[in-house]
Design a protein with these regions (language model features):
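Interfacial helix-start motif at the membrane-water boundary
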Residues: 42-70
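Perimembrane loop-to-helix junctions flanking transmembrane segments
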Residues: 31-49, 176
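Alpha-helical transmembrane segments of multipass membrane proteins
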Residues: 60-64, 87, 159
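N-terminal signal-anchor transmembrane alpha helix
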Residues: 1-30
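Terminal transmembrane helical module of multi-pass membrane proteins
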Residues: 125-178
Length: 178
């Protein structure tokens, strides 16, 4: 069982990454970008570390739903990539930053992609068990543990992301391309 768990995690990590990259390669018109940025600015106006955590958790928890979680996770991945494309359209100076570098080279990006991949792969394992009519009782404890891991990582990630945003806004650190 552990081998299947590890393999499914890495398979969905790869799929999540590819779908995110495809979303980030989307062509976004100036009008769509302006509309997105207006909504995005409203969303993050008074957000803090806990707000980021709540936002990311409301995205992550449905990913545990058997079957549905796979589609929800991949839609979330594409949407996040598309959001990056919209931001690049409105801020061309960040066009040279690889979207995958934000995902894999930032501490909060790693925590988020690990969490989402864990949740999506658990959704796959659960739907596979349902289809094969496997007793689901054996999956309760590992699923609860994984939900705990995801919530903990997203809590830490939310505060790390907020802290880094604050540092960049206060110009306490310089990030290449910003």
């Amino acid at each position: 069982m552990n081998k299947i768990r590890i393999i499914s995690f890495f398979v969905f990590l790869g799929i999540f990454t590819c779908v995110f990259q495809l979303g980030s390669m989307s062509t976004v018109s100036e009008e769509e970008s302006a509309l997105f940025m207006e909504e995005f600015e409203k969303l993050v106006l008074d957000i803090d570390g806990f707000g980021i955590f709540v936002h990311n958790t409301t995205i992550a928890l449905p990913m545990f739903i058997p079957g549905f979680g796979i589609f929800w996770g991949l839609f979330s991945s594409w949407s996040t990539g598309y959001a990056f494309a919209a931001i690049v359209t409105s801020m061309p100076e960040i066009a040279n930053i690889s979207p995958l570098s934000i995902l894999f080279l930032s501490p909060f990006g790693l925590m988020e992609i690990f969490s989402y991949s864990l949740a999506i792969s658990r959704s796959f394992i659960l739907i596979k068990a349902i289809i094969t009519k496997t007793n689901l009782l054996q999956f309760i404890k590992p699923t609860i543990i994984e939900i705990g891991i995801v919530v903990t990582l997203l809590l830490a990630g939310g505060y790390v992301e907020f802290y880094l945003i604050e540092l960049v806004q206060n110009e306490s650190i310089e990030m290449p391309g910003f």
